[in-house]
Each structure stands twice: as structure tokens, then as C-alpha cells.
Amino acid sequence: MIKHLMMAALMSAGVAAPAVAGVAGFGVVNQTGSAVSGLALRRTGTSDWKSVGGGASDGARTSISFSDPDCAFDLRATVAGHGENVWSRINLCEVKSVTLHRDASGTTWVDYD
């Protein structure tokens, strides 16, 4: 009996609790060449945008605090002189910071930290 209890205890000790995925917040670095305003997020594949903060001047970093069980998001920002720009399918569970870029031709991309 004691042998079975010890085996059960050893087996249960090796079982880890499942990891909880989700976003707890992240940083945004603006490298678009212009001021960014009106940051908003939506879950990738949906149409409902949620405002998550003001913005940042070129070269500045801002912190976004929010919590969500999902990971894949689209980020929208209004870039001064260039209108709304959207960066799609950002996995916010795997990154601490995103750097937004926009070149002279209007091409946008994001780098992850």
C-alpha cells in the first residue's frame, strides 16, 4: 500500500500545470519616420478594433497594458501624414516589444523583440 502511495506521489509531482497563454502587455517602438497616434488592436480574423492608447513620436517607445487570452493580433496606428497603417498577425504572446516601420514608398513591417 505504501509503495502505491509513493508511486502516486512521484507521478503527480512530475505533472506540470498547463501553461496559460495570453497577452499581458507589450511595448511599441515607433520607427515610422512620423508621429503615430490612435493605437488600436483587434484579434486577427475579426473586425472589432479596441483602442489601446495614444501614440508615440518618431523614435519613441510606449507601453501598452491589456490582458487577453489570445495571441494573434493586428495593430493599427495613424501615422502623421500617411493615414492608418495596419501591421497584421503579430504574436503578442511571444514578444515583449514590437517596432513599427514604414519606408518612403509606404511599405510597412514590424520587428519583434
Say what each PLM segment does.
Residues 18-66, 70, 78-113:
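Intrinsically disordered, low-complexity segments enriched in small/polar residues
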Residues 8-14:
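Bacterial N-terminal signal peptides
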Residues 1-7:
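Bacterial N-terminal signal peptides that target proteins for export
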